[in-house]
Amino acid sequence: EKVKYFIKDALENWGIKYVMLVGGRHGGVGAEKWWCPVRYSNLDDGSDEAQFLTDLYFSDIYRYENGNATFDDWDSNGNGIFAEWKMMKKDNLDMYPDVYVGRLACRNSYEVKKMVEKIITYETTAKGQDWFNRFVGIAGDTYPDDGDPYYEGELATEAAFNYLDGFQADYVWASNGKLSNEGDIISAIDQGCAFLHFSGHGNPMSWATHPPHNGSVWIGIDVTKFPKLSNDGMYPVCIVGGCHNSQFNVSVLNLLKFKNLKTIYYHSTWSPESWGWWMTRKIGGGSIATIANTGYGYGEPGADCLEFRGRYMELQFFKSYSEGKDMLGETHASGLAYYMDKFPPMDDNVDCKIVQQWELLGDPSLKIGGY
Protein backbone atom coordinates (compact mmCIF):
# COMPACT_ATOMS: atom_id res chain seq x y z
CA GLU A 1 0.00 0.00 0.00
CA LYS A 2 3.02 2.30 0.46
CA VAL A 3 3.65 2.07 -3.29
CA LYS A 4 0.08 3.10 -4.05
CA TYR A 5 0.29 6.04 -1.65
CA PHE A 6 3.52 7.12 -3.34
CA ILE A 7 1.79 6.99 -6.74
CA LYS A 8 -1.04 9.11 -5.30
CA ASP A 9 1.47 11.65 -4.01
CA ALA A 10 3.31 11.75 -7.34
CA LEU A 11 0.03 12.19 -9.21
CA GLU A 12 -1.08 15.08 -7.02
CA ASN A 13 2.27 16.86 -6.73
CA TRP A 14 4.05 16.07 -9.99
CA GLY A 15 1.10 15.49 -12.31
CA ILE A 16 2.40 12.13 -13.53
CA LYS A 17 0.51 10.08 -16.12
CA TYR A 18 2.55 6.89 -16.34
CA VAL A 19 3.85 4.43 -13.76
CA MET A 20 6.18 1.62 -14.73
CA LEU A 21 6.59 -1.05 -12.07
CA VAL A 22 9.96 -2.75 -12.56
CA GLY A 23 10.52 -6.09 -10.90
CA GLY A 24 9.15 -9.59 -10.82
CA ARG A 25 9.48 -12.52 -8.48
CA HIS A 26 12.90 -13.48 -7.14
CA GLY A 27 12.43 -16.72 -5.30
CA GLY A 28 10.67 -17.74 -2.15
CA VAL A 29 8.95 -21.06 -1.52
CA GLY A 30 6.88 -20.71 1.63
CA ALA A 31 6.33 -17.04 0.79
CA GLU A 32 6.99 -15.36 -2.54
CA LYS A 33 9.72 -12.72 -2.74
CA TRP A 34 9.35 -9.75 -5.07
CA TRP A 35 11.68 -7.08 -6.44
CA CYS A 36 8.64 -4.83 -6.82
CA PRO A 37 5.52 -5.38 -4.69
CA VAL A 38 2.38 -6.97 -6.09
CA ARG A 39 -1.25 -6.99 -5.07
CA TYR A 40 -3.45 -10.07 -5.16
CA SER A 41 -7.17 -9.75 -5.72
CA ASN A 42 -9.26 -11.87 -3.36
CA LEU A 43 -12.16 -12.26 -5.74
CA ASP A 44 -13.46 -15.82 -5.53
CA ASP A 45 -15.58 -16.67 -8.56
CA GLY A 46 -16.02 -20.30 -7.57
CA SER A 47 -13.09 -21.57 -9.62
CA ASP A 48 -10.02 -23.19 -8.07
CA GLU A 49 -8.20 -19.84 -7.79
CA ALA A 50 -9.36 -17.63 -4.96
CA GLN A 51 -6.56 -15.12 -5.64
CA PHE A 52 -4.84 -13.69 -8.71
CA LEU A 53 -2.41 -10.90 -9.52
CA THR A 54 -3.74 -7.45 -10.38
CA ASP A 55 -1.69 -4.34 -11.13
CA LEU A 56 -4.93 -2.43 -11.68
CA TYR A 57 -4.78 -1.85 -7.93
CA PHE A 58 -1.85 0.55 -8.48
CA SER A 59 -3.68 2.34 -11.29
CA ASP A 60 -7.01 2.97 -9.55
CA ILE A 61 -6.08 5.70 -7.06
CA TYR A 62 -9.45 7.30 -6.34
CA ARG A 63 -13.04 6.39 -5.73
CA TYR A 64 -15.77 9.01 -6.00
CA GLU A 65 -18.37 9.63 -3.31
CA ASN A 66 -20.93 12.39 -3.81
CA GLY A 67 -18.66 13.90 -6.44
CA ASN A 68 -15.65 13.95 -4.13
CA ALA A 69 -12.48 11.96 -4.85
CA THR A 70 -11.10 9.86 -2.01
CA PHE A 71 -8.25 7.36 -1.88
CA ASP A 72 -9.42 3.89 -2.93
CA ASP A 73 -7.55 1.34 -0.83
CA TRP A 74 -9.54 -1.58 -2.33
CA ASP A 75 -10.63 -2.57 1.18
CA SER A 76 -13.95 -0.79 1.59
CA ASN A 77 -15.12 -3.08 4.40
CA GLY A 78 -11.89 -2.52 6.34
CA ASN A 79 -11.13 -6.15 7.14
CA GLY A 80 -7.61 -6.16 5.69
CA ILE A 81 -8.55 -8.39 2.74
CA PHE A 82 -8.02 -6.45 -0.49
CA ALA A 83 -10.38 -6.65 -3.47
CA GLU A 84 -12.50 -9.15 -1.58
CA TRP A 85 -15.54 -10.75 -3.18
CA LYS A 86 -16.66 -13.99 -1.62
CA MET A 87 -20.35 -14.64 -1.17
CA MET A 88 -21.67 -11.75 0.96
CA LYS A 89 -18.24 -10.25 1.67
CA LYS A 90 -17.54 -7.70 -1.02
CA ASP A 91 -15.31 -4.65 -1.34
CA ASN A 92 -16.89 -1.92 -3.44
CA LEU A 93 -14.25 -0.73 -5.91
CA ASP A 94 -14.04 2.05 -8.49
CA MET A 95 -11.49 0.27 -10.74
CA TYR A 96 -11.26 3.02 -13.38
CA PRO A 97 -7.55 3.83 -13.98
CA ASP A 98 -6.33 7.22 -12.76
CA VAL A 99 -2.76 6.67 -13.98
CA TYR A 100 -1.44 4.39 -16.70
CA VAL A 101 0.39 1.44 -15.18
CA GLY A 102 2.51 -1.27 -16.77
CA ARG A 103 5.04 -3.71 -15.38
CA LEU A 104 8.39 -5.02 -16.50
CA ALA A 105 8.41 -8.26 -14.51
CA CYS A 106 12.21 -8.46 -14.62
CA ARG A 107 13.87 -11.02 -12.36
CA ASN A 108 17.41 -9.66 -12.60
CA SER A 109 19.33 -6.57 -13.71
CA TYR A 110 20.25 -8.19 -17.03
CA GLU A 111 16.58 -8.39 -18.00
CA VAL A 112 16.15 -4.73 -17.04
CA LYS A 113 19.09 -3.72 -19.25
CA LYS A 114 17.81 -5.71 -22.22
CA MET A 115 14.27 -4.37 -21.88
CA VAL A 116 15.52 -0.78 -21.80
CA GLU A 117 17.53 -1.45 -24.96
CA LYS A 118 14.53 -3.10 -26.61
CA ILE A 119 12.20 -0.19 -25.81
CA ILE A 120 14.70 2.40 -27.08
CA THR A 121 15.23 0.42 -30.29
CA TYR A 122 11.49 0.19 -30.88
CA GLU A 123 10.70 3.84 -30.26
CA THR A 124 13.58 5.09 -32.42
CA THR A 125 13.29 2.71 -35.39
CA ALA A 126 9.68 1.48 -35.82
CA LYS A 127 8.21 4.61 -37.38
CA GLY A 128 7.74 4.35 -41.14
CA GLN A 129 8.84 0.73 -41.41
CA ASP A 130 6.95 -1.62 -43.73
CA TRP A 131 6.66 -4.31 -41.07
CA PHE A 132 4.64 -1.95 -38.88
CA ASN A 133 1.81 -2.10 -41.43
CA ARG A 134 1.13 -5.77 -40.62
CA PHE A 135 -1.43 -7.27 -38.26
CA VAL A 136 -1.07 -10.95 -37.41
CA GLY A 137 -4.06 -12.83 -35.99
CA ILE A 138 -3.44 -16.36 -34.69
CA ALA A 139 -6.50 -18.41 -33.83
CA GLY A 140 -8.72 -21.40 -34.48
CA ASP A 141 -11.94 -22.91 -33.20
CA THR A 142 -11.77 -21.99 -29.52
CA TYR A 143 -14.81 -24.01 -28.45
CA PRO A 144 -15.20 -26.80 -31.02
CA ASP A 145 -18.59 -28.40 -31.33
CA ASP A 146 -19.99 -30.32 -34.28
CA GLY A 147 -23.15 -28.23 -34.28
CA ASP A 148 -21.37 -24.88 -33.82
CA PRO A 149 -20.31 -23.12 -37.04
CA TYR A 150 -18.50 -20.32 -35.19
CA TYR A 151 -14.71 -20.30 -34.83
CA GLU A 152 -14.53 -17.90 -31.91
CA GLY A 153 -10.84 -17.05 -31.94
CA GLU A 154 -10.81 -16.45 -35.68
CA LEU A 155 -13.84 -14.19 -35.41
CA ALA A 156 -12.11 -12.23 -32.65
CA THR A 157 -8.91 -11.65 -34.62
CA GLU A 158 -10.90 -10.59 -37.68
CA ALA A 159 -12.96 -8.17 -35.58
CA ALA A 160 -9.76 -6.75 -34.07
CA PHE A 161 -8.28 -6.11 -37.50
CA ASN A 162 -11.46 -4.36 -38.63
CA TYR A 163 -10.64 -1.57 -36.17
CA LEU A 164 -7.34 -0.88 -37.94
CA ASP A 165 -7.06 1.44 -40.95
CA GLY A 166 -4.04 1.26 -43.22
CA PHE A 167 -2.86 -2.16 -42.04
CA GLN A 168 -2.59 -5.49 -43.81
CA ALA A 169 -3.88 -8.65 -42.15
CA ASP A 170 -2.18 -12.01 -42.00
CA TYR A 171 -4.73 -14.44 -40.59
CA VAL A 172 -2.86 -17.47 -39.32
CA TRP A 173 -5.95 -19.58 -38.76
CA ALA A 174 -6.59 -23.26 -38.34
CA SER A 175 -9.54 -23.05 -40.75
CA ASN A 176 -7.53 -21.61 -43.67
CA GLY A 177 -4.67 -24.08 -43.29
CA LYS A 178 -2.11 -21.47 -42.24
CA LEU A 179 -1.97 -22.73 -38.64
CA SER A 180 -0.93 -26.36 -38.29
CA ASN A 181 2.02 -26.22 -35.86
CA GLU A 182 4.24 -23.84 -33.89
CA GLY A 183 6.43 -23.31 -36.95
CA ASP A 184 3.59 -21.45 -38.65
CA ILE A 185 3.35 -19.11 -35.66
CA ILE A 186 7.09 -18.48 -35.58
CA SER A 187 7.21 -17.79 -39.34
CA ALA A 188 4.39 -15.23 -39.09
CA ILE A 189 5.99 -13.40 -36.16
CA ASP A 190 9.45 -13.39 -37.72
CA GLN A 191 8.23 -11.17 -40.56
CA GLY A 192 7.51 -8.43 -38.03
CA CYS A 193 4.17 -6.79 -37.30
CA ALA A 194 2.63 -3.90 -35.39
CA PHE A 195 0.04 -6.02 -33.61
CA LEU A 196 0.04 -9.70 -32.77
CA HIS A 197 -3.29 -11.08 -31.59
CA PHE A 198 -3.67 -14.58 -30.18
CA SER A 199 -7.20 -15.68 -29.28
CA GLY A 200 -7.71 -19.13 -27.82
CA HIS A 201 -6.59 -20.98 -24.70
CA GLY A 202 -3.57 -20.68 -22.46
CA ASN A 203 -1.63 -21.43 -19.32
CA PRO A 204 1.53 -19.86 -17.88
CA MET A 205 3.72 -21.86 -20.28
CA SER A 206 1.74 -22.10 -23.51
CA TRP A 207 -0.99 -20.81 -25.80
CA ALA A 208 -3.05 -23.08 -28.05
CA THR A 209 -6.27 -23.54 -29.99
CA HIS A 210 -8.13 -26.21 -31.97
CA PRO A 211 -8.78 -27.02 -35.62
CA PRO A 212 -12.44 -26.65 -36.63
CA HIS A 213 -14.72 -29.08 -34.79
CA ASN A 214 -11.83 -31.05 -33.31
CA GLY A 215 -11.39 -30.61 -29.59
CA SER A 216 -8.92 -33.48 -29.30
CA VAL A 217 -6.18 -31.69 -31.29
CA TRP A 218 -4.22 -28.73 -29.93
CA ILE A 219 -2.13 -26.34 -32.03
CA GLY A 220 -0.02 -23.68 -30.37
CA ILE A 221 3.31 -22.55 -29.02
CA ASP A 222 4.99 -22.87 -25.63
CA VAL A 223 7.87 -21.02 -24.02
CA THR A 224 10.42 -23.67 -25.04
CA LYS A 225 9.97 -22.52 -28.66
CA PHE A 226 10.52 -18.82 -27.96
CA PRO A 227 14.30 -19.03 -28.57
CA LYS A 228 13.43 -19.65 -32.24
CA LEU A 229 11.76 -16.24 -32.62
CA SER A 230 14.04 -13.97 -34.66
CA ASN A 231 12.01 -10.83 -35.40
CA ASP A 232 14.83 -8.66 -34.07
CA GLY A 233 13.85 -4.97 -34.12
CA MET A 234 10.34 -5.72 -35.47
CA TYR A 235 8.45 -6.07 -32.22
CA PRO A 236 4.64 -6.14 -32.02
CA VAL A 237 2.30 -5.23 -29.22
CA CYS A 238 0.89 -8.65 -28.35
CA ILE A 239 -2.72 -9.18 -27.21
CA VAL A 240 -3.52 -12.64 -25.87
CA GLY A 241 -6.88 -14.24 -25.23
CA GLY A 242 -6.46 -17.29 -23.00
CA CYS A 243 -6.02 -18.35 -19.39
CA HIS A 244 -3.01 -17.39 -17.25
CA ASN A 245 -0.64 -16.36 -20.05
CA SER A 246 0.63 -13.45 -17.93
CA GLN A 247 0.55 -15.13 -14.52
CA PHE A 248 3.93 -13.65 -13.66
CA ASN A 249 4.26 -15.20 -10.19
CA VAL A 250 5.28 -18.61 -11.60
CA SER A 251 8.63 -20.17 -10.70
CA VAL A 252 10.49 -23.46 -10.90
CA LEU A 253 10.71 -23.17 -7.12
CA ASN A 254 7.02 -24.04 -7.00
CA LEU A 255 8.09 -27.64 -7.67
CA LEU A 256 9.37 -27.69 -4.08
CA LYS A 257 5.81 -27.41 -2.79
CA PHE A 258 5.49 -31.18 -2.66
CA LYS A 259 1.99 -31.29 -1.16
CA ASN A 260 0.57 -29.50 -4.20
CA LEU A 261 2.94 -30.93 -6.80
CA LYS A 262 0.24 -32.52 -8.98
CA THR A 263 -1.74 -29.29 -9.21
CA ILE A 264 1.40 -27.21 -9.80
CA TYR A 265 2.50 -29.48 -12.63
CA TYR A 266 -0.95 -29.63 -14.22
CA HIS A 267 -1.40 -25.84 -14.12
CA SER A 268 2.17 -25.21 -15.37
CA THR A 269 2.93 -22.81 -12.53
CA TRP A 270 6.44 -24.27 -12.43
CA SER A 271 7.40 -22.34 -15.57
CA PRO A 272 10.62 -20.32 -15.07
CA GLU A 273 8.71 -17.24 -16.28
CA SER A 274 5.21 -16.67 -17.59
CA TRP A 275 4.40 -16.95 -21.30
CA GLY A 276 3.47 -13.26 -21.55
CA TRP A 277 6.58 -11.96 -19.84
CA TRP A 278 8.87 -14.36 -21.70
CA MET A 279 7.38 -13.16 -25.00
CA THR A 280 8.03 -9.55 -23.95
CA ARG A 281 11.57 -9.88 -22.62
CA LYS A 282 12.73 -12.23 -25.42
CA ILE A 283 16.11 -11.04 -26.71
CA GLY A 284 16.29 -10.62 -30.49
CA GLY A 285 12.58 -11.18 -31.02
CA GLY A 286 9.22 -11.55 -29.32
CA SER A 287 6.99 -8.59 -28.49
CA ILE A 288 7.59 -5.09 -27.17
CA ALA A 289 4.71 -5.54 -24.71
CA THR A 290 2.10 -8.18 -23.94
CA ILE A 291 -1.43 -7.76 -22.60
CA ALA A 292 -2.94 -10.97 -21.25
CA ASN A 293 -4.67 -12.56 -18.27
CA THR A 294 -3.05 -13.34 -14.92
CA GLY A 295 -5.91 -15.73 -14.08
CA TYR A 296 -8.55 -17.75 -15.86
CA GLY A 297 -9.81 -16.31 -19.12
CA TYR A 298 -13.53 -16.39 -19.75
CA GLY A 299 -15.11 -16.75 -23.15
CA GLU A 300 -18.55 -16.98 -24.68
CA PRO A 301 -19.01 -19.80 -27.22
CA GLY A 302 -21.07 -19.47 -30.36
CA ALA A 303 -22.79 -16.61 -32.12
CA ASP A 304 -22.38 -14.10 -29.28
CA CYS A 305 -18.69 -14.81 -28.68
CA LEU A 306 -17.62 -11.22 -29.42
CA GLU A 307 -20.30 -9.56 -27.31
CA PHE A 308 -19.31 -10.70 -23.82
CA ARG A 309 -16.44 -11.74 -21.56
CA GLY A 310 -12.86 -12.21 -22.70
CA ARG A 311 -13.27 -11.86 -26.46
CA TYR A 312 -15.03 -8.54 -25.92
CA MET A 313 -12.17 -7.36 -23.71
CA GLU A 314 -9.58 -8.29 -26.35
CA LEU A 315 -11.31 -6.05 -28.88
CA GLN A 316 -11.40 -2.96 -26.67
CA PHE A 317 -7.65 -2.43 -27.05
CA PHE A 318 -8.03 -2.17 -30.82
CA LYS A 319 -11.06 0.10 -30.48
CA SER A 320 -9.00 2.40 -28.28
CA TYR A 321 -6.09 2.47 -30.74
CA SER A 322 -8.46 3.20 -33.64
CA GLU A 323 -9.56 6.36 -31.82
CA GLY A 324 -6.02 7.74 -31.90
CA LYS A 325 -4.83 6.59 -28.50
CA ASP A 326 -1.30 5.46 -29.38
CA MET A 327 0.41 5.69 -25.99
CA LEU A 328 0.38 2.10 -24.80
CA GLY A 329 -0.77 2.72 -21.23
CA GLU A 330 -3.66 4.89 -22.36
CA THR A 331 -4.65 2.38 -25.04
CA HIS A 332 -4.75 -0.36 -22.43
CA ALA A 333 -6.52 1.71 -19.76
CA SER A 334 -9.14 3.01 -22.19
CA GLY A 335 -9.93 -0.57 -23.15
CA LEU A 336 -10.54 -1.38 -19.50
CA ALA A 337 -12.82 1.64 -19.18
CA TYR A 338 -14.80 0.69 -22.29
CA TYR A 339 -15.38 -2.78 -20.87
CA MET A 340 -16.53 -1.41 -17.51
CA ASP A 341 -18.82 1.12 -19.19
CA LYS A 342 -20.72 -1.76 -20.78
CA PHE A 343 -20.34 -4.30 -17.98
CA PRO A 344 -20.16 -2.55 -14.58
CA PRO A 345 -17.67 -4.68 -12.63
CA MET A 346 -19.49 -4.48 -9.31
CA ASP A 347 -22.55 -6.13 -10.88
CA ASP A 348 -20.88 -9.41 -11.83
CA ASN A 349 -17.84 -11.07 -10.28
CA VAL A 350 -16.64 -12.58 -13.57
CA ASP A 351 -16.73 -9.20 -15.33
CA CYS A 352 -14.89 -7.77 -12.33
CA LYS A 353 -12.21 -10.44 -12.59
CA ILE A 354 -11.82 -9.99 -16.35
CA VAL A 355 -10.94 -6.32 -15.78
CA GLN A 356 -8.67 -6.84 -12.76
CA GLN A 357 -6.55 -9.54 -14.40
CA TRP A 358 -6.03 -7.86 -17.81
CA GLU A 359 -2.33 -7.18 -17.29
CA LEU A 360 -0.01 -4.91 -19.26
CA LEU A 361 3.54 -6.27 -19.24
CA GLY A 362 5.43 -3.44 -20.87
CA ASP A 363 6.24 0.26 -20.72
CA PRO A 364 2.98 2.24 -20.33
CA SER A 365 4.63 5.36 -21.78
CA LEU A 366 5.60 3.53 -24.99
CA LYS A 367 4.43 5.26 -28.16
CA ILE A 368 2.96 2.58 -30.40
CA GLY A 369 4.79 2.83 -33.71
CA GLY A 370 7.59 4.95 -32.28
CA TYR A 371 8.57 8.57 -32.87
Regions found by a protein language model. Give the residues of each.
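Cysteine-dependent hydrolase recognition
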Residues: 1-371
